[in-house]
From Swiss-Prot:
Reported function: One of the primary rRNA binding proteins, this protein initially binds near the 5'-end of the 23S rRNA. It is important during the early stages of 50S assembly. It makes multiple contacts with different domains of the 23S rRNA in the assembled 50S subunit and ribosome. Forms part of the polypeptide exit tunnel.
Organism domain of life: Bacteria
Name of the protein described by the UniProt record: Large ribosomal subunit protein uL4
Gene designation: rplD
Region (Disordered): 54-74
Listed GO biological process terms: translation
Keywords (A to Z) from UniProt: Ribonucleoprotein, Ribosomal protein, RNA-binding, rRNA-binding
Subunit and interaction comment: Part of the 50S ribosomal subunit.
Annotated family: Belongs to the universal ribosomal protein uL4 family.
């Protein structure tokens, strides 16, 4: 088991807790992390880039001028790609960029990303995360006290309006519940601030 300190809102250690090695103590595998990040980013791509091809451009049903006798190159339609208003050759079309990644691989990649944070001392476990009111200033002060003011992924067991709205306008801070934890955001943000309740929930979900 991995022992980590549990901090309070004043960054004081109140106790220590054990982390499940099957979730937070995995061997670091860059290949799994790369596959998971590519999988996530590919799913986010809209793939809406589209141009009109030769068969999509309006007009051009009539031969623009006679075949012989004009001195011009022979043409059959003004929709041909050599014309200014013609269709585009091999242009981008609407497509789906997402691809499959096995569920076991996704789970192992998430365990690996959590292990990266735990092993590099970029994870701060707090006993609880509560705000009396919706105040961005209070949230900034809390993160600064915990040493996580620059780039933070904040994970709680259940989202509350006070936490979400207080962190919404702080640059480089993202809030998620246990179901929203993912490989890309774990690697993207420098610090992981997570409540002890959320740690237990992740262990139940991923162990």
């Amino acid at each position: 088991m991995i022992q980590v300190p549990v901090k309070d809102a004043n960054n004081q250690e109140v106790r220590s807790t054990e982390l499940n090695e099957s979730v937070f103590g995995r061997e670091i595998r860059a290949d799994l992390l790369g596959m998971a990040v590519n999988y996530q980013l590919a799913k986010r791509r809209l793939g809406t880039a589209t141009v009109l091809g030769r068969s999509d451009v309006r007009g051009g049903g009539k031969k623009p001028y006679r075949q012989k006798g004009t001195g011009n190159a022979r043409q059959g339609t003004i929709r041909a790609p050599q014309f200014r208003t013609g269709g585009i050759v091999f242009g981008p079309q609407q497509r789906d960029y997402s691809h499959k990644l096995n569920k076991k691989v996704r789970k192992l990649a998430l365990q690996t990303a959590l292990s990266v944070k735990a092993s590099s001392e970029e994870m701060v476990v707090v006993d609880k995360l509560e705000l009396a009111s919706i105040k961005t200033k209070e949230m900034k002060a809390l993160l600064s006290t915990l040493g996580a003011a620059r780039s933070t992924f904040l994970v709680v067991k259940e989202l509350s309006n006070e936490i979400v709205l207080s962190a919404r306008n702080i640059p480089n801070v993202m809030v998620a519940d246990v179901d929203g934890v993912n490989v890309y955001d774990l690697l993207r943000y420098e610090k992981l601030v997570i409540t002890e309740e959320a740690v237990r929930s992740l262990e139940e979900k991923l162990a």
